A protein has these predicted regions:
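Bacterial N-terminal signal peptides
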Residues: 1-3
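Generic detector of low-complexity/intrinsically disordered segments
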Residues: 5-6, 37-39, 43, 64, ...
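N-terminal propeptides/leader regions of secreted preproproteins
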Residues: 6-118
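Mature secreted bioactive peptide module from preproproteins
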Residues: 90-224
Length: 224
């Protein structure tokens, strides 16, 4: 005799679905070729109101002669709650790619390193246009040639909040696997008013001789 087993969370999931309508949903892009292509093209899927409320950009300590910088943002999910609140989930990625002839997303030139920092974040926009946001998590990766030695990968995320102390989380990957995404949990699950916080993801590849390759993905809030 076959018994039908209904998980305990099924009723709650159905209840949650009744409370909101999913307007859009996509799988997060992590394929290196597709992600690098989108970054080179500057693909930005933020809604117009979020574009007005935020700037997304990449930073690095490397000089312009040492690295090219790229950003891209993917819309992961959009839903509407019964009270009219719109919830949008995004993945913004910053890429710093060492300059060199013939470099690409998968096959880097000798001695080049490409580092990625991704911020996964959520925006809530109420019917009266009040906005709040927070980090879901961050992801970090380095791609490099077989001739390159990466001693460790330093990961950090941060919320710079004008009302409270900065919330941050970090860890170091001592044994790095080339091309692997490493996930860092959010420093807090709290959502902040739009004008009170900025979101950051940092990736630093530590190289021999005290050298490093780094990139920061910054989601900076504007005042409308």
């Amino acid at each position: 005799m076959t018994l039908l087993y209904v998980p305990a969370f099924a009723a709650e999931t159905e209840k949650e679905q009744m409370q909101s309508t999913v307007l859009f949903q996509a799988n997060q892009i992590d394929d290196p070729n597709m992600l690098m292509l989108r970054a080179e093209l500057g693909v930005d899927e933020r809604s117009e109101i979020v574009k007005q409320a935020t700037n997304v950009f990449a930073e690095t300590d490397l000089s312009k002669e040492q690295a090219d910088l790229y950003t891209t943002t993917q819309l992961i999910r959009r839903e509407r709650k019964t009270d009219g609140t719109i919830v949008e989930e995004y993945a913004s990625v910053a890429v710093a790619r060492s300059t060199g002839t013939g470099s690409s997303s998968d096959q880097e030139t000798e001695n080049s390193v490409t580092v990625y920092a991704m911020v996964n974040y959520k925006y809530e926009i109420s019917s009266d246009l009040n906005m709040s946001f927070g980090i879901s998590n961050t992801k970090h990766r380095a791609i490099y040639a077989s001739s390159v030695t990466v001693n460790s990968l330093y990961l950090k995320n941060e919320i710079d909040n004008s009302y409270e102390q900065v919330a941050s989380n970090s860890r170091t990957i001592s044994s790095v696997t080339m091309g692997t995404w490493y996930t860092l949990s959010a420093p807090t699950s709290k959502l902040y008013p739009k004008a009170s916080a900025n979101l950051y993801a940092f990736t630093t590849a530590k190289l021999p001789g005290g050298n490093e390759a780094n990139v920061r993905c910054v989601v900076y809030c504007n005042s409308l």
